[in-house]
Amino acid sequence: MKALKIALTKGRLEKDAVALLEKAGIDCSSMTDKKRKLIFHSSTQPISFILVKAVDVMTYVKHGVADIGIVGKDVLMEASKSHYEMLDLEIGKCQFCLASTPDFDPSSYRRKIIATKYPTVASKFFREKGEDVEIIKIEGSVEIAPVLDLADAIIDIVETGSTLKENGLIIYEKMYPISARLIVNKASLKQNKTQIFHLIDQLEQAIKEELAE
């Protein structure tokens, strides 16, 4: 039986994803002592794990290097490309928010300047509202943009809101909820249908148990 390759997002989401996989009965013990390794193998199942950056999960799945990927909905939305999304994993929950300083007027007709790491998501949001805005892409700490008068407001991912508060910002609008999603390579799904659907069944059961706790 061919080993399924699962691309996991490095970082915060990795920890939650591994915990969910373990709860679903997937052995991930090889990942506990990873050092500089980026490829791991389950000792009990024909499954391998690849640790990559979030945006690269989609690339590995698209090209069939990975059969399955676990990645945040925010990354999928910003990529705005077609991905075969099969399951909401109910982990890594947060949301896109519009935030700024207390003196910001969201109802102003003046053309606003919006700073964000997610220009595609921001454009979609304001287009749906019928607003014409200027969008500035920022790769680093976007929270300081309104404070330094680079932008009128920001669009960013918010989990607890503590970082916004620490920088004197408040949330003006909650936009889109986000969580980790399981995406699948379409060719892999045809070739490994039984294996992939068995894994999905295991994950669905683990998610139900997690939500019931």
Curated annotation (Swiss-Prot):
Task: Quote the protein name from its UniProt record.
Answer: ATP phosphoribosyltransferase
Q: Which gene encodes it?
A: hisG
Which PANTHER family does this UniProt record tie to the protein? ATP PHOSPHORIBOSYLTRANSFERASE, ATP PHOSPHORIBOSYLTRANSFERASE ATP-PRTASE
UniProt domain comment: Lacks the C-terminal regulatory region which is replaced by HisZ.
State the family it belongs to: Belongs to the ATP phosphoribosyltransferase family. Short subfamily.
Its primary localisation, in coarse terms, equals: cytoplasm
Pathway(s) the chain acts in? Amino-acid biosynthesis; L-histidine biosynthesis; L-histidine from 5-phospho-alpha-D-ribose 1-diphosphate: step 1/9
Q: Would I find Lipoprotein among this entry's keywords?
A: no
